[in-house]
């Protein structure tokens, strides 16, 4: 039987670096596509009625004005 070829890594590094290895771009908002609608409704209402979140948003507005 003929020997099977072992894997080779030749030229792979230069190919990947030719256009640069880039980090994946961070998106501002994570997609909610495919997420349970009941969870999304509950999340929206929780954010709306949570006083700690409102405090942090008000602080951000004050800091941005100054």
Curated annotation (Swiss-Prot):
Keywords attached to this entry: Cytoplasm, Ribonucleoprotein, Ribosomal protein
Comp. bias intervals (Basic residues): 15-31
Chief localization: cytoplasm
Compositional bias (Polar residues): 1-14
Cellular component terms (Gene Ontology): cytosolic large ribosomal subunit
A biological process term (GO) from this entry: cytoplasmic translation
Region (Disordered), start-end ranges: 1-66
Location in or out of the cell: Cytoplasm
Domain of life, per lineage: Eukaryota
Biased composition (Basic and acidic residues): 47-66
One example GO MF annotation: structural constituent of ribosome
UniProt record similarity statement: Belongs to the eukaryotic ribosomal protein eL29 family.
Name of the molecule in the record: Large ribosomal subunit protein eL29
């Amino acid at each position: 039987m003929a020997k099977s070829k072992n894997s080779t890594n030749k030229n792979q590094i230069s190919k990947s670096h030719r256009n640069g290895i880039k980090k994946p771009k961070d998106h501002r908002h994570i997609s909610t596509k495919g997420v349970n609608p009941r969870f999304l409704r509950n999340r929206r209402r929780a954010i709306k009625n949570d006083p700690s979140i409102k405090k942090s948003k008000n602080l951000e507005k004050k800091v941005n004005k100054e």
